[in-house]
Amino acid sequence: MINIRFPDGSIREFEAGVNSLDVAKSISPSLAKATVAAYIDDQLKDAKDAINSNCELRLITVKDPEGLEILRHSCAHLLAHAVKELYPSTEVTIGPVVDNGFYYDFSFKESIGEADLPTIEKKMKELAKKSAPVSYRVVPKAEAIEFFKAQGENYKVEIIDSIADEQVKIYTQDNFSDLCRGPHIPNTSVLKAFKLTKLAGAYWRGNSDNEMLTRIYGTCWATKEDLEQYLNMLEEAEKRDHRKIGKVLDLFHFQEDSPGIAFWHDNGVRIWRQVEDYMRASNNKYGCSEIRTPLIADFSLWQKSGHASKYAENMFATKSENRDFAIRPMNCPTCVQVYNTKLHSYRDLPIRMAEFGIVHRNEPSGSLHGLLRVRSFTQDDGHIFCTPEQVEEEVILMVQQCFEVYKDFGFNDFAVKIALRPENRIGDDETWDKSEQMLKNALDANNVSYELLPGEGAFYGPKIEFHLKDAIGRSWQCGTIQLDFSMPQRLGATYIDKNGEKQVPVMLHRAIVGSLERFIGMLIEHYAGNLPLWLAPVQVAVMGISNNQDDYCKEVFTMLEKNGIRAKLDLRNEKIGFKIREHTLLRVPYLVILGKNEQEQKIITIRKHSGEDLGQMSVDDFCAFLDKQIQAKE
């Protein structure tokens, strides 16, 4: 007999060789039905793995985040199974889990399009209903290579060749086998709520020199209700797509001459200025001085900073007069150069610098997505140089600033996470231990709850991430606060301590809205283009019922502009109903409609974008009304 301890502290006896499914059945049939895996002494295992010794056990169900990930990974295998049934000559490659779903890359011998997805999905449902048990075997690499080579799965052979371990796992369901670390669901009947969503192209291993594969995306959920809710959200997201709204509102455009870099139009620049001016005022409030540094620097600077060895593939390089240069992918190394121009005492610290710095990153063309994923963007970077003793207080201030900013922009629901050391990093473990603990202490001191993200920190330090939830429930990773002991040392930043000795300052990197391009894209989708008054590119449209009111329209328009209102004058010889509809589609918050009565009484009639009639008032009263709303960020 063995003893199994449960999360509530209780201990029960079981026969040696029992598995997690058996344990779940002994508690309740419904629990067994929902169980897909288990943590056995903190190791995630398949639900049918035998337990042969005393242990701590935590069952994982489809309702747990880990369970949902297993469900989605297993659904990717089901997709590959269905594709092999329908198109036997197809070679399968990889099928990972992504946000809200999964994808699988295939090398098809025949042409496949979006129209084929319903057929593949139907086959997936047929296979799932067979309730085929899912099992695995551990085999030597050589045996696995022979197994997949015999099936003509050359991509799998290449993957196995690249694995350092001497043994690998092969999972099997019915007549389909796939290479995988697992764990997976106990049987295919668990997969009930899934849908294939789209098809795209993807290069093998992300390298454009390799074959273009067909990537099929899907989503999978614990229940059909969850799936339906997600699909409804996707439908709503389609309506809010910032690329479509940006075209309607004449904000920006993209073209192939400059892939991944936006061309901003007048209306878009108006929004940009509001965001930038707001952040500039916020930085002033929190004691940041503003700097501006070069976009291009000698490649030796990037070698010193560590970017050349860790980030070179994402950097744009150029050559001039036999010197190698790089266009900056990040602002921090050039900011350190400003700090280094003066001798600093510990009494000078903290020194807070802010920069709206343009950066360029060589993102793969397939990953570009409107304003949300670009190759050139402006970052609202801040860099704070301080002593180790000042770190926690500075982080607390930055967290407060972030919370304040997000609420003013209308994001009231957000989560805080700490991204911990990645595998590819600079600096020793002792420094990383100290850095990670400092961020935890700062959040604890501010009573901020947070989630830990192992392996997701920057190569030079851990970071706090702010994830904002938008109006339709999507989560957006936005601001970051990063702790860095390494870069100031590598770039020669120092200060004189109270003993007259040179010390290296701690460097805090922070971005609150992050990429201004991406943040504006988020705002457009969050508000479905109906931006709050203070952000709207055009706040008021002024129009007359007939051309007889043109002079009065001009007079009202001029008064609004003098009061700092972003107004648009519409004197076109069109029917008033047409003008109202057009400016409503353009999401103008307020429409001023002027007729003979308004002209004679020197008043205005106001209509909200929603269609609500606000009645009549003087221009001065309307300006005061607008100003109050703008100041309140409503």
Curated annotation (Swiss-Prot):
Single annotated GO MF: tRNA binding
Listed InterPro entries: aa-tRNA-synt_IIb (IPR002314), aa-tRNA-synth_II (IPR006195), aa-tRNA-synth_II/BPL/LPL (IPR045864), Anticodon-bd (IPR004154), Anticodon-bd_dom_sf (IPR036621), Beta-grasp_dom_sf (IPR012675), TGS (IPR004095), TGS-like (IPR012676)
Cofactor, free-text remark: Binds 1 zinc ion per subunit.
Main location: cytoplasm
Family indicated by similarity: Belongs to the class-II aminoacyl-tRNA synthetase family.
Assembly information from the UniProt record: Homodimer.
Keyword Aminoacyl-tRNA synthetase among record annotations: yes
Gene: thrS
Protein purpose: Catalyzes the attachment of threonine to tRNA(Thr) in a two-step reaction: L-threonine is first activated by ATP to form Thr-AMP and then transferred to the acceptor end of tRNA(Thr). Also edits incorrectly charged L-seryl-tRNA(Thr).
HAMAP family, per the entry: Thr_tRNA_synth
Single GO cellular component term: cytoplasm
Protein name in the entry: Threonine--tRNA ligase
Gene Ontology BP, a term: threonyl-tRNA aminoacylation
Broad enzyme group: ligase
This enzyme's EC code(s): 6.1.1.3
Protein biosynthesis listed as a keyword: yes
Compartment list: Cytoplasm
UniProt-annotated stretches for the region Catalytic: 241-532
